[in-house]
């Protein structure tokens, strides 16, 4: 059964990037709004969405090609759903130390972290979107057409990224 009409790799990548930006960054936006209250900085807070979306989209467009697209997008959806749960609920920031800790955690410690809320995050932010990506019928264009689409998309996204960064450069610099 087909869930979606035929879609290009570029469009599918942009949709997944938008989904992840909108659903898996709750804690990030809560913290940003504490520093920059929405009432006083609505354009900057909204610009964060565009900034994250354009950054993630460019990164994904650079690595997603004909035969690896679904694998990468599905793996990313599953991982970000779980990471989002731990970030939203425990304030965990995933960096290289956290990844090292994952590999040294024993089974009993891991079982203590399981909950219905984690299952909810996994199903609705990871598993169901992953099934949709898996069932999506991708229109494969010629190599030249695919490269041209990616170049156009990446160029527009870099312009968006640079534009947002330049307009709000003082605000972005203060986040560092």
Please annotate each region the language model reported.
Residues 166-176:
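Membrane-interface segments at or immediately adjacent to transmembrane helices
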Residues 112-115, 124:
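Internal alpha-helical transmembrane segments of multi-pass membrane proteins, especially GPCRs
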């Amino acid at each position: 059964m087909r869930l979606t009409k035929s879609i290009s790799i570029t469009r599918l990548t942009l949709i997944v990037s938008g989904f992840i930006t909108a659903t898996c960054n709750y804690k990030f936006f809560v913290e940003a709004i504490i520093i920059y209250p929405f009432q006083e900085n609505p354009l900057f807070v909204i610009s964060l969405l565009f900034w994250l979306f354009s950054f993630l989209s460019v990164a994904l467009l650079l690595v997603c090609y004909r035969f690896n697209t679904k694998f990468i997008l599905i793996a990313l959806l599953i991982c970000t759903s779980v990471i989002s749960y731990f970030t939203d609920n425990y304030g965990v920031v995933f960096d290289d130390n956290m990844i090292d800790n994952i590999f040294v955690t024993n089974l009993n410690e891991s079982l203590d972290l399981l909950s219905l809320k984690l299952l909810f995050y996994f199903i609705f932010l990871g598993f169901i979107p992953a099934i949709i990506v898996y069932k999506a019928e991708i229109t494969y264009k010629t190599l030249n057409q695919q490269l041209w689409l990616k170049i156009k998309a990446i160029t527009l996204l870099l312009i968006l990224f640079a534009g947002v960064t330049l307009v709000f450069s003082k605000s972005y610099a203060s986040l560092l």
